[in-house]
Amino acid sequence: MFTVKPWSSAEVVHEALAIGLFEGKDSWSGLAGEYDSRLGGQLSNLRKEGDISAKRGRIATIHTMLPTGVKRLYFVGLGKKEELTFERLREVFGKLFRTWKQAKRTEAAIALDTFTTETVDSNEAAHALAEAYYLATYEFPGYKQKKSEPDYALESLTVYTAADAAEIEASLFVGSVYGKATNSARTLVNTPGNLLTASDLADYAVELAKRYDFDYEILEKEEMERLGMGALLAVNQGSKQPPKLIVLKYQGKEQWENVIGLVGKGVTFDTGGYCLKPRDSMIDMKTDMGGAAAVLGAMEAIGELRPEQNVLAVIPATDNMISAEAFKPDDVITSLSGKTIEVRNTDAEGRLILADAITYAKQHGARYLIDVATLTGGVIVALGTDKTGAMTNNEALFEQLLEASMETGEFIWRLPITEKDRERVRSSKIADLNNSPGREGHAIMGGAFIGEFAEDTPWVHLDIAGTATTKKDGDLGPAGATGVMVRTLTAFVERFE
């Protein structure tokens, strides 16, 4: 879809051309000024009247009425040059693509160098451009018998730049991979629970593994029973759908060492079990496998980019249902690690299945662990819906993950786990651990519980309950699943040291 070319005004013939504008006179002396001269100063008049603005996020569409060349100019406001960041540029590009989508543009061009600064170079701008295209134009296909509109696609986008074409093409490829992988995760999270069971999720993972030549294994219920995965099996007791433990292995080094373990919560629908959720809280619980989707999305990107790392992805998959066989409050279960757990809340099931998955990942070579889960409503109370909560037992690992999150624009905020928090999850009088010792510090209790299974292995817990979905349309996509943490995990794996 992307074509990279050097600028030559004599050859520029397009339905639409986007030009970036920074506040100040400098940007008007470049390409914008060139078109202003060709149009007899009319653009300057429109700028004076406020119809063309350099304020960040403002987009002005100008019909040139020229007999040849560019039919429409899109002036894209970028704000102050010194304030432009990768994330802000990505959002602006997203707004531009949503504008083109609404106008049904299928062919366009961008003067890339008008969107760059000393801190955001052409390669970064190209990455932001490609990523923003896929994120901003995403739509969940849905299940309506008749679609109101055909699927949109920008068939051709010419990127004009003076930078090295091969480098720009490489950046466009990486940005496309990030965007497409995020959209894959979005689609998984948006899929209804009756159409995405644990078996369906396992089938998806197998197809992914075959596509990218990963080693894989799907552990069935019988194997879990043999191994002693009592925590995952307990959560699955009330379901007619069999549980699955999905294991994907990407080996980017000669030796299977320094393995990064990515563990994603895969609860395909959560009723809360016998600690039943109220109706309003149960709506959208199809999204409770957002952690699994993030890990699978990251594995898709890793399969495309082939970094020199070793990655083990482990996804415990089940739903949490009610039946005569379902697990109950006051049950005591034995996890794969051998630690016993007193169940005080059947709606605190995510940490149970993650316990067995983390133990399994450690047993199969993971030396670093990152788990991703829509774990607690408490993290939303604490941090809102734009920040992912993080907990860790290792400063160095967390700092690398934090750097990746800042690079990709997926904001994370660290919450503490103290010795008193650990004492609370160890507070059961009849078992090693209590899965829900109270509402106070609820998000931290979830992380502290999972940390009991990470033990001394460097580990970061990411609670995406607030960030996995959004209720409103934005510059980078529609309401629904966000695919959060796909990009952060991918960037982390690529740059891990």
Curated annotation (Swiss-Prot):
Q: Where is the signal peptide?
A: none
Documented EC number(s): 3.4.11.1, 3.4.11.10
Q: Which GO terms describe its cellular component?
A: cytoplasm
**From which source organism is this entry?**
Geobacillus thermodenitrificans (strain NG80-2)
Residue ranges crossing the lipid bilayer per the database entry:
none
Gene Ontology terms: biological process: proteolysis
Cofactor note text: Binds 2 manganese ions per subunit.
Q: Where does Mn(2+) 2 bind?
A: 265, 270, 288, 349
Q: Does the keyword Transmembrane helix apply?
A: no
Role played: Presumably involved in the processing and regular turnover of intracellular proteins. Catalyzes the removal of unsubstituted N-terminal amino acids from various peptides.
Give start-end ranges for the coiled-coil region(s). none
Single GO MF annotation: manganese ion binding
Q: What is this protein called?
A: Probable cytosol aminopeptidase
Cofactor(s) required, per the database record: Mn(2+)
| InterPro entries per UniProt | Leucine_aapep/pepB (IPR011356), Macro_dom-like (IPR043472), Peptidase_M17_C (IPR000819), Peptidase_M17_leu_NH2_pept (IPR023042), Peptidase_M17_N (IPR008283)
- Keyword Cell wall biogenesis/degradation among UniProt keywords: no
In this record, what's one Pfam family? Answer: Peptidase_M17_N
Residues annotated to bind Mn(2+) 1: 270, 347, 349
Family annotation (Gene3D superfamilies): Leucine Aminopeptidase, subunit E, domain 1, Zn peptidases
Reaction catalysed by this enzyme: Release of an N-terminal amino acid, Xaa-|-Yaa-, in which Xaa is preferably Leu, but may be other amino acids including Pro although not Arg or Lys, and Yaa may be Pro. Amino acid amides and methyl esters are also readily hydrolyzed, but rates on arylamides are exceedingly low; Release of an N-terminal amino acid, preferentially leucine, but not glutamic or aspartic acids
